[in-house]
Design a protein with these regions (language model features):
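Terminal alpha-helical segments
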Residues: 1-142
């Protein structure tokens, strides 16, 4: 891959959509459980909750794209993943802004030694929940 093309799509169908939907459910559940625990300086659980919420949003986006487009994103350039999700009508377009916000905090919560506020973590979990609801809608039998 060239430096400009840091992502690709892979073929995906109903099986992949179901698997990614189940992963999204698990990530969102774990984020909620971790968020409910008391935070302390040694164990920064709010950051962990937000990081897991981001993973839930990514898995939900994969589920939506798999079922609506027959493909999902793989790579480092998440702007391409946002573009793919926006094409996955109608659910992807509806939660695009939540996905953009989750990806916007990804580096902070996963790679930086920065304290995540309770408000930031709660917002990430809400965004991830909305994405999960959209993925469940997209994957529900018609």
């Amino acid at each position: 891959m060239s430096p400009r093309n840091r992502g690709k799509t892979i073929m995906a169908g109903e099986d992949e959509a179901r698997a990614r939907l189940n992963a999204a459910r698990a990530f969102v559940s774990v984020a909620e459980l971790v968020y409910a625990e008391p935070d302390d300086p040694v164990l920064p659980l709010r950051g962990v909750a937000a990081a897991v919420a981001v993973l839930g949003g990514i898995a939900a986006a994969d589920a939506i794209c798999s079922v609506r487009l027959g493909e999902m994103f793989r790579g480092d350039d998440h702007t391409q993943a946002v573009d793919l999700l926006a094409r996955a009508q109608p659910e992807g377009a509806r939660v695009r802004s939540d996905f953009v916000r989750l990806l916007g905090i990804k580096d902070k919560v996963q790679y930086q030694a920065i304290i995540v506020t309770p408000s930031e973590a709660a917002t990430a979990i809400r965004q991830s929940r909305r994405m999960l609801a959209a993925a469940e809608e997209a994957c529900s039998p018609r």
